[in-house]
């Protein structure tokens, strides 16, 4: 028997004001289960403020026991919820979201149930529930009759989507893809087991690593700030701005950025969607174009703006002599509170760009690869600065992406349940989020892997990597 399933659950707000409907959150509950099978369209409430369907657990389990293929949209979510709620199912599965992904053959299209059905013209999701979701009202408190209509409709259109996809798989151009769909279904079950098992994180080690690299980031910030002041005077540089970092390294900036991009043919070709080809120039031609279309950046000395007394804002006066209620940005200092006076000394490191490939839309390239390459070719104070910047950027990413990500999603018992996704990349490779648990730093550069421990006494962690398996 083929059974289509759709579940609704409660959710909690996470630290970033997003929604966490995870079955692993201790406060989340399975609210309802919708089924479409040989027994018709059925709907059961397992937890709701208005009603609970009597004997529903036994009935739902009976349906699952008779099911030979379980179908759902984003089925891994539904399957994990059912298993975590105590239901049992070990049969075959089919996810219509993965089916659509496979049939798209690498072309990026939205895989929501709404968009999949809309493209195939086989029905629409009931969006009346959106008002309650926007208000932060969870499914257990939304009127039960509305939840039931919404859930029954989801099951119906998921079944239509399944039938439509099965017809597509019969087409000569898609016949071989059914094997891929079966494999992806088997993999979905494995991933659901992995996510349910989770990973044990040693929170004490995580805090120690976090403190160590937070301290190094603070040290590098101080070191970089000192170098920037020596090179730029009172001009502040936002190191996250490629344009401002370019001023510091190359001591020059474009006179007209639009014209600059045109001269060096920077941007994307609208016809091909690829980067435009840079002009072929001799070194002398290149240097001449840079010189004629850029201006030097000079060190500055700042003094307090007298117009606003260094506050950056003023209160304008009405014709009757009374002040306006709200403050206005000071036009003399543009809200900065300081007036910057250009000095006669050139700012920055005055690095010389070598070719058109060093040029960017806002000046000169300062991406990670360029900075690392430039550091290896430099010496003295420039080398010291570039090494510090490269290390600072790496630590910043490490702290915000890996440490903070793991910290935010690990529960008080040290269990982490990353989400593994099969239908995000164009190539079919796996991806993960909440947190990103792929591409963890290797070797001794960053010891993030120290925090992952076996949950068993005297247990070991085995790491296996299949090189280019796909």
Question: Which residues does each predicted region cover?
Answer:
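Short consensus segments that form the blades of beta-propeller domains
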Residues: 21-26
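Short alpha-helical segments and helix-capping/turn motifs at coil-helix boundaries
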Residues: 18, 55-62, 176, 446-449
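Active-site-proximal helix-loop-helix substrate-binding element of RNase H-like nuclease domains
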Residues: 28-35, 39-171, 183, 292
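Short glycine-rich phosphate-binding loop at a beta-alpha junction
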Residues: 68-74, 236-238, 465
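A short acidic (Asp/Glu
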Residues: 14-16, 80-85, 248-249
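Cytochrome P450 core scaffold surrounding the K-helix E-X-X-R motif
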Residues: 12-16, 44-46
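Conserved beta-strand scaffold positions in the cores of enzyme catalytic domains, especially
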Residues: 2-4, 42-44, 93, 461-463
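Conserved "right-hand" nucleotidyltransferase catalytic core of DNA-directed polymerases
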Residues: 1-9, 13, 27-34, 119, ...
């Amino acid at each position: 028997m083929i059974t289509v399933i759709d579940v609704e659950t409660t959710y909690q707000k996470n630290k970033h004001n997003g929604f966490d409907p995870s079955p692993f959150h201790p406060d989340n509950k399975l609210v309802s289960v919708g089924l479409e099978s040989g027994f018709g369209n059925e709907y059961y409430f397992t937890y709701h403020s208005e009603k609970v369907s009597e004997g529903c657990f036994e009935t739902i389990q009976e349906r699952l026991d008779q099911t030979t293929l379980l179908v759902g949209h984003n089925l891994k979510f539904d399957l994990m919820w059912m298993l975590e709620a105590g239901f049992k199912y070990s049969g075959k599965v089919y996810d219509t979201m993965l089916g659509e992904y496979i049939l798209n053959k690498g072309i990026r299209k939205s895989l929501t149930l709404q968009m999949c059905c809309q493209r195939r013209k086989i029905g629409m999701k009931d969006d009346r529930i959106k008002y309650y979701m926007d208000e932060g009202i969870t499914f257990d408190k939304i009127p039960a009759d509305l939840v039931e209509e919404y859930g029954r409709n989801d099951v119906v259109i998921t079944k239509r989507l399944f039938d439509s996809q099965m017809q597509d798989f019969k087409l000569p151009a898609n016949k071989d893809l059914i094997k891929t769909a079966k494999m992806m279904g088997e993999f979905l079950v494995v991933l659901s087991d992995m996510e349910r098992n989770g990973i044990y994180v040693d929170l004490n080690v995580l805090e120690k690593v976090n403190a160590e690299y937070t301290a190094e980031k603070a040290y590098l910030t101080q070191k970089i700030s000192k170098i920037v002041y020596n090179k730029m005077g009172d001009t502040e540089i936002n190191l996250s701005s490629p344009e401002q970092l370019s001023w510091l390294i190359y001591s020059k900036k474009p006179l007209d950025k639009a014209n600059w991009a045109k001269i060096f043919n920077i941007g994307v070709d609208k016809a091909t969607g690829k980067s435009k080809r840079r002009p072929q120039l001799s070194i002398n031609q290149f240097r001449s174009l840079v010189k004629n279309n850029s201006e030097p950046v000079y060190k500055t000395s700042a003094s307090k703006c007298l117009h606003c007394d260094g506050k950056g804002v003023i209160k304008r006066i009405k014709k009757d002599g009374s002040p306006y209620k709200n403050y206005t940005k000071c036009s003399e200092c543009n809200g900065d509170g300081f007036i910057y006076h250009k000095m006669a000394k050139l700012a920055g490191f005055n690095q010389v760009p070598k070719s058109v490939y060093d040029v960017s839309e806002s000046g000169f390239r300062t991406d990670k690869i360029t900075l690392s390459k430039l550091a290896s070719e430099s010496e003295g104070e420039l080398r010291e600065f570039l090494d510090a910047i490269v290390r600072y950027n790496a630590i910043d990413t490490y702290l915000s992406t890996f440490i903070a990500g793991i910290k935010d999603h690990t529960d008080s018992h040290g269990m982490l349940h990353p989400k593994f996704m099969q239908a995000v990349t164009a190539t079919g490779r796996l991806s993960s989020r909440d947190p990103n648990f792929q591409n963890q730093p290797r070797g001794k550069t960053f010891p993030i892997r120290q925090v992952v421990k076996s949950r068993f006494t005297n247990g070991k962690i085995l790491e296996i990597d299949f090189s280019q398996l796909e």
